[in-house]
C-alpha cells in the first residue's frame, strides 16, 4: 500500500518558510532605505526589487517544486530548503550569500544583511 503524503501540511510549512524569508528580506532592505535607492513590491509571492540603475532582482516561490527562485542580473538560482536554510541546487551556497552579493553588485554598494 502506498503512503499518501499530506501535501496540505507540507504546503502550509512551505508557505510559512516563504513568508519568513520574504519578511527577512523586507527587513534587510529597509535597513538601507536611507542610504541607497531600493524599491520593492510583493504581489502573489513575487518580490520585485528595483535599484536606482533600473536593474531588477526577482524572487518568487515555486510551490509545485517547493523552491524559491531568484533572478538577478548575473544568473537565475533555484533554492531548496535544507538543514534550516535555503540552499542553491547548483552551487550549494545559501540564499543569503547569493542574494547579498547580487544586491551589492546591482546597487554598487557593499550591503551586509542580518540573516536572523
UniProtKB/Swiss-Prot annotation:
GO molecular function, a single term: ferrous iron binding
CDD domains in UniProt: Frataxin
InterPro entries in alphabetical order: CyaY, Frataxin/CyaY, Frataxin/CyaY_sf, Frataxin_CS
GO-annotated cellular components: cytosol
UniProt keyword Metal-binding present: yes
Keyword Calcium: no
Superkingdom assignment: Bacteria
UniProt-listed GO biological process terms: iron-sulfur cluster assembly
Keyword annotations of the record: Iron, Metal-binding
Function of the molecule: Involved in iron-sulfur (Fe-S) cluster assembly. May act as a regulator of Fe-S biogenesis.
Family assignment from sequence similarity: Belongs to the frataxin family.
NCBIfam families noted in UniProt: FeS_CyaY (TIGR03421)
Protein name per UniProt: Iron-sulfur cluster assembly protein CyaY
Lineage, opening ranks: Bacteria, Pseudomonadati, Pseudomonadota, Gammaproteobacteria, Enterobacterales
Amino acid at each position: 500500500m502506498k503512503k499518501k503524503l499530506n501535501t496540505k501540511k507540507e504546503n502550509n510549512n512551505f508557505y510559512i518558510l516563504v513568508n519568513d524569508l520574504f519578511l527577512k528580506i523586507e527587513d534587510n532592505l529597509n535597513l538601507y532605505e536611507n542610504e541607497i535607492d531600493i524599491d520593492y513590491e510583493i504581489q502573489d509571492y513575487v518580490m520585485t526589487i528595483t535599484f536606482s540603475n533600473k536593474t531588477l532582482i526577482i524572487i518568487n516561490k515555486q510551490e509545485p517544486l517547493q523552491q524559491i527562485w531568484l533572478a538577478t542580473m548575473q544568473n537565475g538560482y533555484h533554492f531548496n530548503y535544507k538543514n534550516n536554510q535555503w540552499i542553491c541546487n547548483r552551487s550549494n551556497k545559501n540564499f543569503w550569500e547569493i542574494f547579498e552579493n547580487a544586491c551589492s553588485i546591482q546597487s554598487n554598494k557593499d550591503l551586509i544583511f542580518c540573516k536572523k
